[in-house]
A protein has these predicted regions:
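Short histidine-centered beta-strand/loop micro-motifs
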Residues: 45-47, 65-72, 89-90, 97-98, ...
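Short, surface-exposed beta-edge/turn micro-motifs
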Residues: 53, 74-77, 122
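Short beta-strand segments in beta-sandwich/barrel cores
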Residues: 66, 83-89, 104-105
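Short, conserved beta-strand element in jelly-roll/cupin
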Residues: 72-87, 127
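Short acidic-glycine-tyrosine-enriched beta hairpin
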Residues: 92-110
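Ligand-binding loop in jelly-roll beta-barrel domains
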Residues: 101, 110-135
């Protein structure tokens, strides 16, 4: 995993997310993967950006999401690019669902547990404050834990 200062070619956000950092910097993240070792390397490489750092990624999927997640360092923008997506937030124990179609977006407030379900093939773009992101298996109807509880410090 490495941050690239200048990428002259097109970037596929599905395989190469872009880190938005302090000073309005945008750096492609080559070799990014959703495994603990790479996430740790990414977190270390962008630590100086703190809560102001953002990761821009496109996800393609089909069906329900596996996990609840929350981002205590900042809000997350979720944009539906294609298909239909339902974002479910846990608001004081009550599910709050937002259905998105192509071109529609929603903002998950900082610290709010949320999950994303795709009704058939769909794509989303996310802009995420990754510092301190927490994940919980989606084995129950809602996540456990409180908004202030600490968790793994990965994007």
């Amino acid at each position: 995993m490495r941050l690239v200062n200048h990428e002259p070619d097109a970037i596929d956000l599905r395989t190469t997310p872009v880190h938005l950092g302090l000073g309005s910097r945008a750096k492609p993240v080559e070799g990014f993967a959703w495994d603990p070792e790479v996430l740790h390397a990414y977190s270390a490489a962008v630590a100086a950006d703190g809560a102001e750092g953002r990761l821009v990624t496109i996800f393609d999927g089909d069906g329900p999401g596996d996990d609840w997640e929350r981002h205590p360092a900042g809000d997350e923008l979720v944009v539906c690019l294609s298909g239909s997506v339902t974002v479910t937030r846990d608001v004081d124990g009550v599910p709050d669902r937002v259905v998105l179609g192509p071109g529609e977006a929603t903002v998950n407030p900082a610290g709010t547990w949320h999950a994303v379900d795709m009704a058939g093939p769909a794509s989303i773009l996310t802009v995420t404050a990754g510092l301190g992101t927490d994940h919980r298996p989606r084995t129950e109807a809602r996540p456990t834990g409180h908004a202030g509880a600490s968790g793994p410090r990965t994007p």
